[in-house]
Design a protein with these regions (language model features):
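Short coil/turn connectors at secondary-structure junctions
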Residues: 2, 30-32, 102-103
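Short beta-strand/turn micro-motifs composed of small residues
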Residues: 9, 38, 131
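Secondary-structure transition/turn motif
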Residues: 9-13, 92
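Non-catalytic substrate-recognition/targeting regions of SAM-dependent transferases
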Residues: 15-85
């Protein structure tokens, strides 16, 4: 993310060479900060403990702003899931964005609003994001404001399957559902 890098080392061989990787990335990309955010099932399978620390620079005081496909996202690179944002989903966000114009959109398991914010950037009729993480939905809501679309936005915290059942029970329907 510009002058901040996030490394997610999920394999033992990467962990063993992490200092070399940080040095090489620093030499080539000249970042101000490098965050190591290694946590999750993959590390457990490799016999590794969680590892979250700053390899270079300072921890950002708050979530960082990330512009992508005309939308604005906020990523918590220090405490967020994986690297703070699913940046590898850019092409998929763009694909959904192209489909979303004028449609009501339900983004399930939305994290920080990946598909929903992309839909907003292309004038979706409405966007509802559902996730189990209150901090992630807070970042999605910030992104909705920063994207400055006229699209009505709603963030719902809860178990995705329970929420979808509740929405169906209320008679709510959507023209585009991403989960």
């Amino acid at each position: 993310f510009a002058d901040l890098l996030v490394i997610q080392p999920n394999a033992a061989w990467v962990d063993q060479r992490l200092s070399l990787l940080v040095a090489a990335l620093s030499d080539i990309l000249k970042p101000k900060s490098v965050v190591v955010n290694g946590a999750g099932r993959a590390r457990v399978l490799e016999g590794l403990d969680d590892a979250r620390f700053m390899a270079l620079g300072d921890i950002p005081a708050e979530a960082i702003e990330v512009a992508m496909n005309g939308a604005v996202y906020f990523a918590d690179v220090a405490e967020g899931q994986k690297t703070g944002i699913f940046y590898d989903q850019r092409p998929n966000h763009k694909f959904v964005q192209d489909l979303a114009q004028g449609k009501s959109v339900l983004d399930v398991f939305s994290h920080v609003g990946g598909f929903g914010l992309a839909a907003m950037a292309n004038d979706a009729a409405s966007v509802t994001c559902v996730d189990g993480s209150k901090p992630a939905l807070s970042l999605a809501s910030r992104g909705a404001v920063a994207t400055r679309a006229e699209t009505p936005f709603e963030a719902i915290k809860g178990d995705a399957f329970d929420v979808m059942g509740e929405l169906a029970g209320q008679g709510k329907t959507y023209e585009l559902v991403i989960c």
